[in-house]
Amino acid sequence: MREIISIHVGQAGTQIGNACWELYCLEHGIQPNGYMNPETASQNSDGGFSTFFSETGQGKYVPRSIYVDLEPNVIDQVRTGPYRDLFHPEQLITGKEDASNNYARGHYTVGKELVDEVTDKIRRIADNCSGLQGFLVFHSFGGGTGSGFGALLLERLAMEYTKKSKLQFSVYPAPQVSTSVVEPYNSVLTTHATLDLADCTFMVDNESCYDICRRNLDIERPSYENLNRLIAQVVSSITASLRFEGSLNVDLAEFQTNLVPYPRIHFPLVTYAPIVSAAKAFHESNSVQEITNQCFEPYNQMVKCDPRAGRYMATCLLYRGDVIPRDVQAAVTTIKAKRTIQFVDWCPTGFKIGICDRPPQHIEGSEIAKVDRAVCMLSNTTSIAEAWSRLDHKFDLMYSKRAFVHWYVGEGMEEGEFSEAREDLAALERDYEEVGQDSMEVDYMEEEY
């Protein structure tokens, strides 16, 4: 079987993890205590969920996952929450002191004490897999544990599991909404540390999710639970073809092959449709054409940037539910005919399609309406460079005054690492600029040299 291990790091990783496992359990008919719901057992006989769950001798299903945080509060809520019986106690790992929003604490001092225990637990889960496919790491760029410990853990995974896929789901600092002052430092440092280690990084920013909740779901003041349930639907769509039967299934390695033209350019933009409230759902047809068009609208994106200003290099459309390939082909042809959607000239086909037969699952009490079909689009576009330049600008403003740097140096980090990380991100911005140029332009520039 092609198993996948999910690793949830820090507060953001843990809370997104809670929403994801709640949804996976619903989709596979597994109760919060880990046992199969007898009413839905017959529907889930295909066994595809063994990619994400392992089965014990007593017929209990245990997630192939690890939760880790340097302070206990958030994971304690999992230990006492409705899904406390789902997880093995050894899968929930906590330290005693916080990373205090400091990358250096998560990466060098506090994180170092915990990393051996975590890699040991991961090894134990990996040994229980017959054909491990890879890892999904959930964390935030801005927090101390998410950025510092997340990077440290990826370094270990890269050493021990060189050939396995390593995909990240990262909460990226939003343009306006900020949860900490030093977010730009942590984000630049962790991106630099993991740039060569992760195979593919799906970014979400809270501001985009807030806007989607406000505009599409009519929630005046969205909570983190609303955001995480929205993100969980996206994660579920990306992993659905690994867990269910479908007419066009997409493997983990296929994502990379189709979405990553160069190793460093591995930050696809995530878009999901339809996101509608129950009140609006009755008035919308949600045809394949309609939901495909919605994916190219900026207001359904998970990161704030303008795709109309950039060019698409590769696009992966993952459909779920009542979808037939012919409709998809028609929708894609219409999209290609639109002049507003620009592709780079060196990638003529540009579309990878996945179709999973199982429609998205509705969570009781969730604002997202039940729909027959949905699509998640992963697109590698040059416009995401906008997000990097925004982040770099914030970094520069603080670093020009060396503000807050002493907190990092005090934890054993060298100041040179800041400028090294910043240079690496400047190079990343240039990489995006170059791949967006037409091949004719590039040839012309080379001749001039």
Curated annotation (Swiss-Prot):
Subcellular location(s) of the protein: Cytoplasm, Cytoskeleton
SMART domains: Tubulin (SM00864), Tubulin_C (SM00865)
UniProt KW keywords: Cytoplasm, Cytoskeleton, GTP-binding, Hydrolase, Magnesium, Metal-binding, Microtubule, Nucleotide-binding
CDD domains, A to Z: alpha_tubulin (cd02186)
Residues where GTP binds: 11, 71, 140, 144-145, 179, 206, 228
Biological processes per GO annotation: cytoplasmic microtubule organization; microtubule cytoskeleton organization; mitochondrion distribution; mitotic cell cycle; mitotic spindle organization; nuclear division; nuclear migration by microtubule mediated pushing forces
Gene Ontology cellular-component annotations: astral microtubule; cytoplasm; cytosol; microtubule; nucleus; spindle; spindle microtubule
Entry GO MF terms: GTP binding; hydrolase activity; metal ion binding; structural constituent of cytoskeleton
Catalytic reaction annotation: GTP + H2O = GDP + phosphate + H(+)
Reported effect, residue 246 to D: Temperature sensitive
A Pfam family per the record: Tubulin
Record EC number: 3.6.5.-
Residues engaged in binding Mg(2+): 71
Active site annotation, chain numbering: 254
First-listed, main subcellular location of the protein, grouped into a coarse class: cytoplasm
Role of this protein: Tubulin is the major constituent of microtubules, a cylinder consisting of laterally associated linear protofilaments composed of alpha- and beta-tubulin heterodimers. Microtubules grow by the addition of GTP-tubulin dimers to the microtubule end, where a stabilizing cap forms. Below the cap, tubulin dimers are in GDP-bound state, owing to GTPase activity of alpha-tubulin.
Family of this protein: Belongs to the tubulin family.
Assembly description: Dimer of alpha and beta chains. A typical microtubule is a hollow water-filled tube with an outer diameter of 25 nm and an inner diameter of 15 nM. Alpha-beta heterodimers associate head-to-tail to form protofilaments running lengthwise along the microtubule wall with the beta-tubulin subunit facing the microtubule plus end conferring a structural polarity. Microtubules usually have 13 protofilaments but different protofilament numbers can be found in some organisms and specialized cells.
Entry protein name: Tubulin alpha-2 chain
Organism, as annotated: Schizosaccharomyces pombe (strain 972 / ATCC 24843) (Fission yeast)
